Every structure is written in structure tokens, then in C-alpha cells.
């Protein structure tokens, strides 16, 4: 639950001012493994942004927004605890860099 001091400044404003991924975790009260964050900090925050984009936060209290943001950060973080940034392919450069292997193509007219 939110305390009165947490409701004075919008959590979105606090996150906009955050200078590091660790500040996101601290602001939202999410526990994390520093090793996971060191490897995937940008990926986690990008995924959090993707998840937040699908949330409707309009008209919610700051406490409700904080809880939603916390849940979204936990979900994004869990994605990278369970797998690597390369597996998740959040950024276009990773999506394009290593394409999944395709089966060999043999045209029918090559078979005789």
C-alpha cells in the first residue's frame, strides 16, 4: 500500500527522473539480482515500457499507478531472469542480428 509521502509526487515523474535501472527498482520497491540487471538493464526497461504501453493508467490514483508500474517491472525483470536478452530480442538489432536457423531449401526442380 502507498504511504502518504509516496502520493505527493507522481511515480511516473519519479521514474522519468531516475538516472539508472537500479533507481526504477528502488522507487518501485522491487527486489532484484544485480547480476541480472547489469547484463540486461536496458532490455528490462525497454520491456517494461512495452508492457506499460498496453496499460491504461488514466484516472488512476498515484497508489494504483505505482502498483501497476511495480507489477510491470516485476514482469519485465522476470523475463530476463528466465532467459537472456538474446532469447528475448527486445531491440531491433538483436531481432535482426541472429536470425533463427531455417531449414535448408531444396527446389523441386533440383530433384531428379
Curated annotation (Swiss-Prot):
It comes from the Bacteria. InterPro entries: NifW. The keyword Hydrolase does not apply. The keyword Mitochondrion does not apply. Keywords: Nitrogen fixation. GO terms for biological process: nitrogen fixation. NCBIfam families: PRK00810.1 (NF002009). Belongs to the NifW family. May protect the nitrogenase Fe-Mo protein from oxidative damage. Homotrimer; associates with NifD. This is Nitrogenase-stabilizing/protective protein NifW. It comes from Rhodopseudomonas palustris (strain BisA53). The gene is nifW.
Amino acid at each position: 500500500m502507498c504511504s502518504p509521502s509516496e502520493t505527493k509526487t507522481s511515480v511516473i515523474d519519479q521514474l522519468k527522473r531516475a538516472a539508472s535501472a537500479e533507481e526504477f527498482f528502488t522507487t518501485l520497491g522491487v527486489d532484484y539480482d544485480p547480476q541480472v540487471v547489469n547484463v540486461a538493464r536496458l532490455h528490462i526497461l525497454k520491456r517494461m515500457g512495452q508492457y506499460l504501453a498496453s496499460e491504461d493508467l488514466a484516472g488512476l490514483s498515484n497508489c494504483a499507478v505505482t502498483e501497476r508500474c511495480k507489477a510491470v517491472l516485476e514482469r519485465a525483470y522476470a523475463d530476463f531472469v528466465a532467459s537472456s536478452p538474446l532469447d528475448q530480442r527486445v531491440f531491433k538489432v538483436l531481432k535482426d542480428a541472429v536470425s533463427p536457423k531455417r531449414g535448408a531449401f531444396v527446389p523441386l526442380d533440383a530433384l531428379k
